[in-house]
Amino acid sequence: MKKFLFNFLKKNKSSNSERYKNYIIPKINEFSKSIESKNTISFLHYGHLGDIINSLPTIKLLSRTKNCHLYIQSNKKIPNHAISKDHPSGDVYLTRNSILKLIPLLKQQRFLHKVETFSNQKIDIDLNFFRELPINFNIDSVRWYSHLTGTFPDLSETYLNVPSNEKYKNSIVIMRSLRRQNDKIDYSFLSSYIK
């Protein structure tokens, strides 16, 4: 049994290494060539919403020297092993309705020259490709997109701008996900901020 497991793991490791060498690296090299050679870069993302927001620092950094267009694909099926009963879009990453709600926010970002729903436009960088990388997806990371583009944005800089809203002037807004919650957090510490 020990020998079987050793051979299985060795074969699996070899297979992953070949996949990395023959599939992942060439694709990342394609992305790099687009970045080096083009003045306008088109990006594709199909979500989740948080993943799209996480891609913005990388796009913003590239926008310093490029015109950046972002296309968002609707109704891309989530693989069966990753479907969550709590996911707001069911068995797809993003519904068309979700995208239509997100696009006005994205259009306010000055570094995005164009934001549209994907309808077979030519794509230079598929931001969904991070899902092909051999990384842990249980950890939500803005840095996934650096692996695809070779760019490393300063995450202390603002990358999502919204107009101020007087309604929430003296409010603390907490963003929570149905899939990722920490029931150990006691929010009573926020009471010290009450004016």
Question: Across the structure, where does each feature detected by a protein language model lie?
Answer:
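Catalytic machinery of carbohydrate-active enzymes
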Residues: M1-K195
